């Protein structure tokens, strides 16, 4: 475990001067090319469900020189520079931006593909983004300014690797708790419980159909993490919903995404 994780122990509340809070803000720094970051996104989806009244999550593409250089090296234009593309997607809302980056990651991580304009165009469409607005936003001056803001935030929080999560309570005088790397789900729930400092009533996930309708686009890995079902049972339930014409499997990328049919 990292030094940050070791700060939280069963009897550490008094030492850390932690008092009960009602809301935690989590900054999630990710590398779009990282398999660990892709796995963490499913864990964060589960946290959002169970602790939705206690946490808010802000995703930030890690603006390190290494990540931005890789984004630039793999691009032929601003459209397929994933750092700029993600910022443009964000201007159309957090949910659509997250769908967009999940689609891109599912293309480039399992198959180790190079990002192309056609790939990005497909992901824009499947994420429900407005293509013309997206292109306009790519040329907006506020886009690179927004990247500079992310860079400032990352430096202030001393982010050195991705994935990294930084947990903040409501006390502006308290430093954030940084957790670098990928850990089992129960580690993150333990941190949330320690920071809240009072009894937490976790929410149960909605029905599988309702969750897919809410999110519009999901990965099977995300569903397996959230529902903790055997994969055989999950496949059966997904097939049942597909036969009922309530969801459909995306032909690309790799059929690992399921989309609600409206």
Curated annotation (Swiss-Prot):
GO-annotated cellular components: cytoplasm
Oligomeric and partner information: Interacts with Spx.
UniProt keyword annotations, A-Z: Cytoplasm
Gene: spxH
UniProt-listed HAMAP family: Adapter_SpxH (MF_02245)
Principal localisation: cytoplasm
Family to which the UniProt record says this protein belongs: Belongs to the SpxH family.
Compartments it resides in: Cytoplasm
Protein's name according to its UniProt entry: ClpXP adapter protein SpxH
Lineage per the UniProt record: Bacteria, Bacillati, Bacillota, Bacilli, Bacillales
Residues that span the membrane, as ranges: none
Highest rank taxon of the organism: Bacteria
Species assigned in the record: Staphylococcus saprophyticus subsp. saprophyticus (strain ATCC 15305 / DSM 20229 / NCIMB 8711 / NCTC 7292 / S-41)
Pfam families assigned: Thioredoxin_5
Function comment: Adapter protein required for efficient degradation of Spx by ClpXP under non-stress conditions. Interaction with Spx stabilizes Spx and exposes the C-terminus of Spx for recognition and proteolysis by ClpXP.
Gene3D superfamilies xref list: Glutaredoxin (3.40.30.10)
